[in-house]
C-alpha cells in the first residue's frame, strides 16, 4: 500500500477489523502496521498511541452503531422502533466484539467528540420515548437501563458466560419484553 494512501479512517477501519478478529486486548501497533503494509513508526503520523486508536475505535463503534440502530427503526415507531433498535444494538455488539469492547468504557462527558459519537443513538431513543407520555427524567433512567441491559447481555454472550443450555435468543427476547413492559408502566407517571 502506498504510504500516501494511509488515512486516519483507513487505520481505524483496519483496527476495527483486526480487533474483531483477534480481540481488543490483542491488538497491537505492529499488527495494524503489518496489515497496512507499513512500518509501525509510520502510524505515528496519524495517531499518538495504541490507547489513541482504542479511543477512536470507541467513537467509531458508537457512530456506526448509531447508524445501524437508526436504520433499523425506519418505518416503525414507539415500542416497535425501540425493539428494533435493541436488536440492532445486540446484533452489532455480538458481530463486532473487538469494537464493542472499546465501546464499553464510553463516557460522553469526557470530551465533545465522545458526546457527539452517541448523539444519534441517544437522540433517536429520546424521540421514540418522549411521545409515549414518559417524563424526561424517566426517559433518562430508561436509557440507562437499556444501555445496562444491552451492554451487559452482549458482554456475557461475547464471553460465552451463559452456560445454561436454554436459548440465548429466548433469554434476550424475554428480557426485552420485561423491560418494555416496565417502560409501559411509566406512561403518564412523573
Task: Map each language-model feature to its residues.
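Helix-turn-helix
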Residues: 10, 14, 18-52, 56
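Short hydrophobic clusters on alpha-helical segments that form packing/core surfaces
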Residues: 11-19, 61, 65, 89, ...
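Alpha-helical DNA-contacting segments of helix-turn-helix folds
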Residues: 19, 53-61, 100-103, 107, ...
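Amphipathic alpha-helical linker/stalk segments
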Residues: 59-84, 122-131
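Hydrophobic alpha-helical connector segments
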Residues: 70-98, 136, 142-146
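Amphipathic alpha-helical segments used for helix-helix packing
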Residues: 90-112, 153-163
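Amphipathic C-terminal alpha-helical segment
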Residues: 102, 148-165, 180-189
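Amphipathic alpha-helical packing segments from all-alpha helical-bundle domains
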Residues: 108-136, 140-144, 170-181
Amino acid at each position: 500500500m502506498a504510504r500516501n494512501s494511509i488515512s486516519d479512517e483507513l487505520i481505524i477501519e483496519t483496527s476495527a477489523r483486526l480487533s474483531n478478529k483477534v480481540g481488543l486486548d490483542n491488538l497491537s501497533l505492529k499488527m495494524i502496521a503489518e496489515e497496512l503494509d507499513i512500518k509501525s513508526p509510520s502510524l505515528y503520523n496519524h495517531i499518538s498511541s495504541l490507547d489513541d486508536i482504542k479511543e477512536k475505535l470507541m467513537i467509531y463503534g458508537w457512530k456506526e452503531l448509531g447508524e445501524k440502530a437508526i436504520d433499523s427503526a425506519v418505518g416503525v415507531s414507539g415500542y416497535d422502533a425501540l425493539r428494533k433498535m435493541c436488536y440492532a444494538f445486540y446484533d452489532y455488539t455480538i458481530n463486532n466484539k473487538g469494537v464493542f469492547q472499546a465501546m464499553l468504557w464510553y463516557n460522553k462527558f469526557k470530551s465533545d467528540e465522545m458526546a457527539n459519537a452517541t448523539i444519534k443513538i441517544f437522540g433517536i431513543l429520546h424521540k421514540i420515548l418522549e411521545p409515549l407520555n414518559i417524563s424526561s427524567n424517566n426517559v433518562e433512567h430508561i436509557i440507562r437501563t437499556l444501555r445496562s441491559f444491552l451492554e451487559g447481555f452482549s458482554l456475557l454472550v461475547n464471553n460465552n458466560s451463559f452456560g445454561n443450555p436454554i436459548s440465548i435468543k429466548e433469554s434476550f427476547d424475554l428480557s426485552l419484553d420485561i423491560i418494555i413492559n416496565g417502560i409501559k408502566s411509566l406512561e403518564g407517571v412523573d
